[in-house]
Amino acid sequence: MSKKLLIKTWGCQMNEYDSSKMADLLNAANGYELTEEPEEADVLLLNTCSIREKAQEKVFHQLGRWKTLKDKKPGVVIGVGGCVATQEGDHIRERAPFVDVIFGPQTLHRLPEMIKQSQSEDAPVMDISFPEIEKFDSLPEPRAEGATAFVSIMEGCSKYCTYCVVPYTRGEEVSRPMDDVLYEIAQLAEQGVREVNLLGQNVNAYRGPTHDGEICSFAELLRLVASIDGIDRIRFTTSHPLEFTDDIIAVYEDTPELVSFLHLPVQSGSDRILTMMKRPHTGIEYKSIIRKLRKARPDIQISSDFIVGFPGESDKDFQDTMKLIKDVDFDMSFSFIFSPRPGTPAADYPCDLSEETKKERLYELQQQINAQAMRYSRLMLGTEQRVLVEGPSKKNLMELRARTENNRVVNFEGSADLIGQFVDVKITDVFANSLRGEIVRTEKDMDLRSVISPTQMMAKTRREDELGVATFTP
């Protein structure tokens, strides 16, 4: 009987990516198969996020539930990973001594070894160090699960915004070697992946070493990924205004695989608040980037992150944010009330704003962006949109669900053999959270670009033989 593994994931897309790699690692090393039933699991892993308020209490609440299972089934292994594990490792050991394994985002590759050690020594094991690129060197071959895939190209953050814990929990910025990234994406393309989402805390800060000792910029990487046959759509998240340079903007002019949608966090429209946040840009500088982007790609739509109620935020500061939202005409946002993160400078800033005022500001901001998003959706009515078919519709299994470049779900009638392919649809109806369409043409009638096959890309990419000697085919 196979061993069972349950992974509970909280947080960002990077955590989702990490959890998928944990599952692959434990399957390859020990034959663990995923389950959604805690009672079935031999290993219970919690991949945590420390961005939101009360993250630690949420972790201990979940661990309390799992302790009940461990009391009934003493052999079950409980592990805590992610950013809360890095921040609170010693506290977890003290408050939840029944936890067997504690690991950080940069040490998840050691999971099979750590689980085995905890079982053989009957003692907790903890590793929350930052071994830089070692994590990526130790991950298993990628496995495609559908037509879209996430690929982590860099880790960490070196910006140290005053409100953010990421530099303390994921370490400084470290970029994966260019060849490793391209090799992974080519493997995924061979397995049928059509869209890749490049991940990093500051993904456009990517500076990946190449086989010949040079450095590959993010703009260069985008063009190389776009050249792989089968990869016909590229997204990336999360980017930072500081590194959103003109060479990246130029890629939008000549690379159709790069979607006309960008998530570029600004956090506030007030220069005073941006300075307090230690954000290295002003509102005008942010708008300048957007103007250049829209010149290069007129139909591009922008989403952002916003923090309301930051310590010291005045009515004028908030109105500056609202003005920026209207000026840029954002299509979407992730917006939150400020919550102090332990260990960050902003946690010690005095704040005299009432909770009621913070909630009112958040509501006003979200209502404005929702109105802008609905206007964008209505503008799509009657237009043709190229969509990637993801699977059956969640509301009607007899229909298909697809996604537009600007991240909207479209439901339409079609046969199951279209799943994993691109189709052009005409938008016939607009709803609050989705669109409806009808097929205009299928992929066989499209002129999708072909440059280099996945097999050729893998052959060109640096590998090492069994002795660890690097090889490269130019």
UniProtKB/Swiss-Prot annotation:
GO terms for molecular function: 4 iron, 4 sulfur cluster binding; metal ion binding; N6-isopentenyladenosine methylthiotransferase activity. One of its GO terms (cellular component) is cytosol. Its main location: cytoplasm. Its cofactor is [4Fe-4S] cluster. [4Fe-4S] cluster 1 binds at residues 12, 49, 83. Residues 143-375 form the Radical SAM core domain. Belongs to the methylthiotransferase family. MiaB subfamily. This is tRNA-2-methylthio-N(6)-dimethylallyladenosine synthase. The lineage of its organism: Bacteria, Pseudomonadati, Pseudomonadota, Gammaproteobacteria, Vibrionales. The gene is miaB.
